[in-house]
Amino acid sequence: MVAIRVIRDAGADTQVPLPSYETTGAAGADIRANLPDRGSLTLAPGGRALIPTGLRVEIPAGYEIQIRPRSGLALKHGITLPNTPGTIDSDYRGPLGVILLNAGAEPFEVVHGERIAQLVVAPVVQARFELTEALGETERGAGGFGSTGRG
């Protein structure tokens, strides 16, 4: 298990739980809204907002945290993340915010303390990019965007 060090932002509500896994087999830890006024924020249909979590993290070198939508919010309310997955790099120490997008037809109220997204800790492999004269041939070739079948 990888340890992620966490601190709270100044003024954050200390009663809002830290990210947590809701089941023993969960890949993602739920993260919650930590709104400055302890109230709520309404996202109009098509609207988006940066929702504060009140947290900062220290991720070990060789890892990242991916921020992903919660499937229930997406299915029931159309709430998603426009930059899915969002990436938190191991050298970032700033406040964690989650960009929520209301792709639904109705306004959605983000409530203080509510679970708004999932954090997935993942290993990182950095590559070396080498300029070359040609690429190796494959059966697929340059076919993309549905070239191997419908969608």
From Swiss-Prot:
Spell out the Gene3D superfamilies in the cross-references.
2.70.40.10
Q: Which HAMAP family match?
A: dUTPase_bact (MF_00116)
Which pathway, metabolic or otherwise, does it act in? Pyrimidine metabolism; dUMP biosynthesis; dUMP from dCTP (dUTP route): step 2/2
Alphabetized UniProt keyword annotations: Hydrolase, Magnesium, Metal-binding, Nucleotide metabolism
The cofactors required by this protein are:
Mg(2+)
Name the reaction it catalyses.
dUTP + H2O = dUMP + diphosphate + H(+)
Biological process, per Gene Ontology: dUMP biosynthetic process; dUTP catabolic process
Q: What is this protein called?
A: Deoxyuridine 5'-triphosphate nucleotidohydrolase
The species is Ruegeria pomeroyi (strain ATCC 700808 / DSM 15171 / DSS-3)
